[in-house]
Amino acid sequence: RHRGLNFAEVDIHVITATDLRLERDPHRTRLLETAKRLRPRLLPLDPLVRLQGIDENNEGEVAQLLAYFRLLQRRLDLSVMLVHHTRKNAAGGVAAGQGLRGSSDIHAFGDSNLYLRRTRQRLVLSNEHRAAPASPPVYLELVATNAETTHLEVIAELHQEQRRGLQE
């Protein structure tokens, strides 16, 4: 139990298939039919790289995969959450999405994007939104006072001069 929520009572389903390739059938059809049956509000796909076999740099292949995710979103009235990684040499800063691996279509797909990165032994959470200005980045810390309530906690908001330092 955390913050009044008993996780044993939450209706969560996990896909445990050993092989899931969402760029092709029958995998696409099975996911669509499963989601129709379960009616999730949120479909987390984590990590994206393990759920497909396309060339992430090929815009055509990426566009087809993202079109399938958009179809799921619209047909089933759910939110699709993609967990994706940055390039190893990606610079931080205001446009964190520019550092994502692969085609820029992956960055453009998101209506709201959250970016978590480590800098100087701290976690920084930044965001981008399609229809609203981004809020200031924040520092997060993993708080583990006891095993039952381990959580991330906002410990500070980054001020303008600190944000400039992240971009360098």
Predicted features along the sequence, with ranges:
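Conserved inter-motif catalytic segment of the P-loop NTP-binding fold
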Residues: 1-60, 64, 71, 118
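Generic detector of low-complexity/intrinsically disordered segments
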Residues: 7, 24, 142-144, 154, ...
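DNA transaction DNA-binding modules
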Residues: 39, 148-168
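Phosphate-binding/switch region of NTP-binding enzymes
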Residues: 42, 50, 60-152
